[in-house]
Amino acid sequence: MSVTIKDVTYIAELAKLRFSEPEMETMTNELNNILHYIAKLDEINTDGIQPLSGIYDPVNVLREDVELQPLTSSEVLHNAPDRQDRFFKVPKVIG
């Protein structure tokens, strides 16, 4: 299978792309090189090789849900740079 300039023109129109004539020839050559490489992969003997669905086994990386005591207001505000009563005090943002 090979790609022609007509094929590249059609694909470019679908993708709403515009190429000059030299770019069309470059794209045609590059696509043909890619297809040639893929055809070489078809020549590889894969008899007896198990198909892979992915490289890594899925692993649950979440920790167990453990109920902890909530922090008190004073513990939460302990390191606050500025506070007012039980609230964080921040600089005025909107005029």
UniProtKB/Swiss-Prot annotation:
Keyword flag Protein biosynthesis: yes
GO MF term (any one): glutaminyl-tRNA synthase (glutamine-hydrolyzing) activity
Signal peptide: none
Pfam family, one: GatC
Membrane-spanning residues: none
Function: Allows the formation of correctly charged Asn-tRNA(Asn) or Gln-tRNA(Gln) through the transamidation of misacylated Asp-tRNA(Asn) or Glu-tRNA(Gln) in organisms which lack either or both of asparaginyl-tRNA or glutaminyl-tRNA synthetases. The reaction takes place in the presence of glutamine and ATP through an activated phospho-Asp-tRNA(Asn) or phospho-Glu-tRNA(Gln).
UniProt protein name: Aspartyl/glutamyl-tRNA(Asn/Gln) amidotransferase subunit C
Top-level taxonomy: Bacteria, Pseudomonadati, Chlorobiota, Chlorobiia, Chlorobiales
